[in-house]
Amino acid sequence: MEPGAGGRNTARAQRAGSPNTPPPREQERKLEQEKLSGVVKSVHRRLRKKYREVGDFDKIWREHCEDEETLCEYAVAMKNLADNHWAKTCEGEGRIEWCCSVCREYFQNGGKRKALEKDEKRAVLATKTTPALNMHESSQLEGHLTNLSFTNPEFITELLQASGKIRLLDVGSCFNPFLKFEEFLTVGIDIVPAVESVYKCDFLNLQLQQPLQLAQDAIDAFLKQLKNPIDSLPGELFHVVVFSLLLSYFPSPYQRWICCKKAHELLVLNGLLLIITPDSSHQNRHAMMMKSWKIAIESLGFKRFKYSKFSHMHLMAFRKISLKTTSDLVSRNYPGMLYIPQDFNSIEDEEYSNPSCYVRSDIEDEQLAYGFTELPDAPYDSDSGESQASSIPFYELEDPILLLS
């Protein structure tokens, strides 16, 4: 060997770095992502901590909405995460793309018609299998069958209404990700918008008015002329309402319940509520929680149309099947069923979960990644008559979707 060759080879190897060491640019990107996700998670933790200490979620939320500095910092961090980090690490599992895909399937590719056909078959079957009904129940069922009949002019109009643009309300929109899709007439709202195209609106305190008695093109024109900020909206205005990473933001299950109830009132009959909520555990670990959410949301007058599990989130689509909310809060605590694992953490648990105190090891990351699989839609599709299995609830300390590494 040429003298000094060994030394030169060693130097080259050192310059190249270990094969397991990410390049400097990648390290910088990960550090920035951890910093941004720390901003977001600290806001969530502070809200939950205040809720445990005070208990008055109205007061806590009012103070939170007045803290403009924190809200602006949160909005900038979320937009940066979405623009520069999530889009690069979620290929094939994008939440926005999933929402668009479900809307196309439902409104443009026959999904809505198939769901309504199943409703009609179930109603007909109920008349054959149910013992003698009293006169009131019988007249109710006959009315339901009339509404479902494919010869009913109103039913045909309902099917054709979405032939124009799909009116979509994106709650907690931040940076208005649906604006770029031509098939949507999008209204994005947020308590602190990150871009000018998003309207300022506190959805929890949004006032609802009587539905507009206007033609479809007139309703579209109304939406294009909304004033900023938005304090009130007519009911039955949208074909789609999106809650993307929204419900876990709130510290109280009752606040999540209020959001779902308002979504029901804002949707047209057979409109879709799309819910995405973070969860990095394997597909069955929080099955009990998802079953609980399904029961609570369906009690409002929804029926689940689709469910998917991605590596870092649950994705659910519910269709509005009744004009009135039907939930009976006397016999069952439906709001309490919209829980998240963090609701059960103590203040000490939240403080321990601070990223500066604990960072998951590479081995733990690999073990976590090993359990990541996508849950197929069909077996857990309510419209197919299937149900979801339950499992023991698992308490998580963080919102793992924020660190998609």
From Swiss-Prot:
S-adenosyl-L-methionine binds at residues 95, 172, 190, 202-203, 244. GO terms for cellular component: cytosol. Changing residue 202 to A: Abolished binding to S-adenosyl-L-methionine without affecting ability to associate with GATOR1 and KICSTOR complexes. It is an enzyme of class 2 (transferase). GO terms for molecular function: methyltransferase activity; protein-containing complex binding; S-adenosyl-L-methionine binding. It comes from the Eukaryota. GO terms for biological process: cellular response to amino acid starvation; cellular response to methionine; methylation; negative regulation of TORC1 signaling; positive regulation of TORC1 signaling; regulation of TORC1 signaling. Residues 1-34 are annotated as: Disordered. Residues 25-34 have a biased composition (Basic and acidic residues). Its EC number is 2.1.1.-. Keywords: Methyltransferase, S-adenosyl-L-methionine, Transferase. S-adenosyl-L-methionine-binding protein that acts as an inhibitor of mTORC1 signaling via interaction with the GATOR1 and KICSTOR complexes. Acts as a sensor of S-adenosyl-L-methionine to signal methionine sufficiency to mTORC1: in presence of methionine, binds S-adenosyl-L-methionine, leading to disrupt interaction with the GATOR1 and KICSTOR complexes and promote mTORC1 signaling. Upon methionine starvation, S-adenosyl-L-methionine levels are reduced, thereby promoting the association with GATOR1 and KICSTOR, leading to inhibit mTORC1 signaling. Belongs to the BMT2/SAMTOR family. Interacts with the DEPDC5 subunit of the GATOR1 complex; interaction is disrupted when SAMTOR binds S-adenosyl-L-methionine. Interacts with the KICSTOR complex; interaction is disrupted when SAMTOR binds S-adenosyl-L-methionine. This is S-adenosylmethionine sensor upstream of mTORC1. It comes from Homo sapiens. The gene is SAMTOR.
